[in-house]
Amino acid sequence: MAQVNDKGLASGGKLEIVKPVGKRRITHAIHDIDGTHSLIRDWPPVMSISIHHAMTGGLADDFDSDAQAQRLIAASGRQPLPETDRFCVESAGLSALTQMEFGIRRAIQLGNLPKSANLPLTPRVLADNARVIERMWQGEERFEDIPEPAAIRAFIQERTPRLFRLYEKVLNGACRDRNTADARKNPAKWRVPGSLEFMQYLHGLGVKNYFVTGAVIYPEGGMYEEVLAVEFAIGPGKMVEALEGSSWDRKMPKDEVMRELFTRLQVDPSHALVIGDGRTEMKAGTDMGCVTMSRLPHDAKRQREMHVGFGVNYIVEDYVDPVLRKLIQA
């Protein structure tokens, strides 16, 4: 049996104790992947330019063509894009479909639409669209309470998955495929330091580990391939029990995935450890009464400010500090 016990421990080294837990039994752990354990996906510059393309480029019928993908691959990370760069920081942890929807809604707000769209952009519709955008900045993902014309919803529902697929194409070309290939040869290079050993340590204590991601999971390629490349064993009874992911066209916020997983496994959230670097999983973890550990670099000042505001219990830079074995013991 594993337990967290921070009594007698103090912040120092690579561990910051934000909100002490005391002593508590841990049976399950929910882990984010990107930035928390794997470094393969350098997603922020790719997402930034993909969203920027959507909100400024007009969303014409060919906005997601292969030619556009190649153009975005070449331009990814080449210049600062203040609004979308900031949105990627603020929205880390949201489902990719919500992040893509932001780009579509900003295009509507800016009037960057194809003439063929013929949307009913009345002052009321634009005001409601602006409300949704503001709520996205605050980390919300569900907006069914805001009434919108069917034509607006249909346009967003048609364009958003297409933008998601374009983003994945650009991600693959800009970094993901190259980094995954290198990870097969040099897996430690593409893991957060100490990540694999820490996961093995938790598994050895009897903790059941689950990966939860906003990426789409499919049998071959994608996130599943990346996780295997950095040497995490997945399957019942293995280091990681399962990989829970998203869908191309159905929004699946991480907090909802986590709640469904706890219900399915009949897990008391107070005995779960949540480890991540995104706002959604960490706020959900604190809201559900889990033990929460944010994995954030020392210079991630805005993210650290946000996570402290959510009320996380601990912040770590990586998993190398021996104090983690004192914090979590048998």
Name every feature range the model reports, one short phrase each.
Residues 67-151:
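Non-catalytic, alpha-helical, charged scaffold/linker segments
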Residues 244-245, 312-323:
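Short acidic-hydrophobic, aromatic-tinged amphipathic segments that line or gate anion-handling sites
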Residues 228, 250-266:
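Short loop-to-alpha-helix "cap/lid" segments that border enzyme active sites
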Residues 2-80:
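Active-site neighborhood of HAD-like aspartate-dependent phosphohydrolases
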Residues 17-20, 25, 30, 149, ...:
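Short, acidic loop-to-helix structural element flanking the phosphoryl-transfer center
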Residues 213-216, 221-229, 271-317:
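Acidic, Mg2+-coordinating phosphoryl-transfer loop and its flanking beta/alpha structural elements
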Residues 196, 200-210, 214-245:
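Substrate-recognition/cap helix-loop segment adjacent to the acidic, metal-dependent catalytic center
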Residues 199-206, 262-263, 282-289:
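Surface-exposed amphipathic alpha-helices with a cationic face
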